[in-house]
């Protein structure tokens, strides 16, 4: 079994991105499955170019995308990605789309195919604050989630995919009064999420 797990580079003036810091701390193998780690750029063009090539090349059994949601107090598992790019903040290339589709002619939305509620339940049982989120926003995180699910759909693949938002790390919250979480807790949470995806795949006969 093979799982592609991505995090993002820093953006918005931050020196780190807790999503990538947590992802790169994951083991290379979890319960016999290969964990492929990749850092994505915080650019609308980058995720739409890189993710399709990466998914088709690696053909993973699951794709778990992660990103920073500064201000959220818990790990949030996204339910849906929408075909919209709309941002008040430029991406790392200075691009600021307004009411543009991620892909012209693609569906309005895709639901995550990882077990969203089961992941949240497992995280909470491990005493890690977690919740289901019904919006991944309209910035690069949503674009990445939509791109992954659209790529899998048009390629006829059976790969499971979803997105997990993580809070600021404690380091990032030193100078701002915002909710934060220890990087080790975030990393542990991602490992639990991966194991729940394994359970889901096993039940379906992967």
Curated annotation (Swiss-Prot):
Disulfide bonds: none annotated. The keyword Hydrolase applies. It is found in: Cytoplasm. The active site is at residues 78, 141, 165. Keywords: Cytoplasm, Hydrolase, Protease, Thiol protease. Pfam families: Peptidase_C15. Its EC number is 3.4.19.3. One of its GO terms (cellular component) is cytosol. InterPro entries: Peptidase_C15, Peptidase_C15-like, Peptidase_C15-like_sf, PGP-I_bact-type, PGPEP1_Cys_AS, PGPEP1_Glu_AS. It is an enzyme of class 3 (hydrolase). It catalyses: Release of an N-terminal pyroglutamyl group from a polypeptide, the second amino acid generally not being Pro. The keyword Flavoprotein does not apply. GO terms for molecular function: pyroglutamyl-peptidase activity. Removes 5-oxoproline from various penultimate amino acid residues except L-proline. Belongs to the peptidase C15 family. This is Pyrrolidone-carboxylate peptidase. It comes from Thermococcus kodakarensis (strain ATCC BAA-918 / JCM 12380 / KOD1).
């Amino acid at each position: 079994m093979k799982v592609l797990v991505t995090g993002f580079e820093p953006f918005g003036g931050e020196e780190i991105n807790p999503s990538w810091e947590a992802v790169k701390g994951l083991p290379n193998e979890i319960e016999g499955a290969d964990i492929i780690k990749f850092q994505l750029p915080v650019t609308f063009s980058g995720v739409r170019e890189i993710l399709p090539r990466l998914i088709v090349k690696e053909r993973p059994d699951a794709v778990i995308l992660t990103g920073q949601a500064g201000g959220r107090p818990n790990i949030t598992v996204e339910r849906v990605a929408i075909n919209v790019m709309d941002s008040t903040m430029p991406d790392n290339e200075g691009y600021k789309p307004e009411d543009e589709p991620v892909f012209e002619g693609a569906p309005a939305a895709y639901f995550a195919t990882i077990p969203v509620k089961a992941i949240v339940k497992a995280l909470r049982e491990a005493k890690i604050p977690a919740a289901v989120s019904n919006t991944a926003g309209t910035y690069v995180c949503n674009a990445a989630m939509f791109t992954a699910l659209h790529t899998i759909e048009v390629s006829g693949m059976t790969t499971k995919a979803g997105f997990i938002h993580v809070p600021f790390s404690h380091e990032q919250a030193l100078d701002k009064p915002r909710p934060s979480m220890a990087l080790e807790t975030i990393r542990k949470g991602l490992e639990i999420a991966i194991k729940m995806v394994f359970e889901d795949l096993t039940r379906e006969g992967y």
